[in-house]
Amino acid sequence: AFGNPVADTGKALLCAAKPVTDLGITAVDDKTLKVELNVPVSYFLSLMYFPTFYPMNQKFFESCGDTYGTSADTVLSNGAFVLTSYEPAATAFELVKNADYYDADRIALDGLNYQVIKDSQQALMSYQNGDLDITLLNGEQVEQVKDDPEFTSVGAGYLWYISPNMDAVPELANLNLRRAITFALDRDSITNDVLKDGSSPAYTAVPAQFATGPDGSDFSADQTKFAEFCAYDPDKAAEYYEQAKAELGKDSFSFTMVVDADDAPQKVAQVVQEQLQTTLPGFTLELKVEPKKQRVQDMQDGNFEIGLTRWGPDYADPMTYLGMWVTG
């Protein structure tokens, strides 16, 4: 996870220069939390919606022991809805309106019923049969229903990217090899011809229409340097590839990329594999398909060469993306 030390002395705390008691956060009373900020932070309140900051009843938590959060009876919360039915690996869970919620009069829904349907076609059929009110679609389904008046396209804000493990694989630390890889990727083809689900090619580190700068313009409009290195340019790819081969003293390269066992990531990975191996002679990319949980764990442990992964925004500020690239 990536965050920013917006609380008073937060940076010093992260660097272990000060104790937790100096963080700048005080419990005024049982229902009031005071946070002192270093600078004005427009997105601070939205940070408080993040699960990391949910209040926890210590007495209840300790009474549940290892079973905390594993069933409806071991979950205690103060939100707009109350979890009434849930079991691990359940195919459905239910929430009902919390009558004690401080703003209950403004909550229009009486409850929410979630159905866990792993097969995307079955999920669409359940929607069409009236069993679901909302469902997510894959690219093929979007093609089928895009003219339906009930179809709505909403940007999720996820940024998919290829992560090279430069610490474990010395060749990937070579700048020219990485430049060869990025110029060999046709992002427009991936989104328009493969995904076909409304996804946009990523030419900026912060997606368009996510945030505005101080002058009111779209923040992504100024990310020209990032866009420059995301352009599909086979000639530049070949040029950087030759430089990389000369610097590394190798004519061929072989890497393995870990990929989620879901439909869309696998399709993208196959196209990435084809584009790289076609544009860069002697470049081999093997695909290792894993359940998402295992893929994430392997990448966290450094047990990978290249990973196809994604990042979604945690709060409404460009640093939710840019913070990933800050070192030190």
Give the label of every model feature segment.
Residues 1-6, 294-328:
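Acidic-aromatic pocket-rim loops
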Residues 7, 11-22, 31, 37-107, ...:
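Gly/Pro-rich hinge or "lid" segments in bacterial periplasmic/extracellular proteins
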Residues 201-243, 264-266:
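Structural transition elements
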Residues 77, 105-110, 175, 234-256:
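Immediate post-signal peptide segment of exported/extracytoplasmic ligand-binding proteins
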Residues 99-144:
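Ligand-site clamp/hinge motif
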Residues 88-90, 238, 242-313:
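Ligand/substrate-recognition segments at binding pockets and active sites
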Residues 30-36, 79-80, 109-111, 158-211, ...:
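Alpha-helical secondary-structure segments
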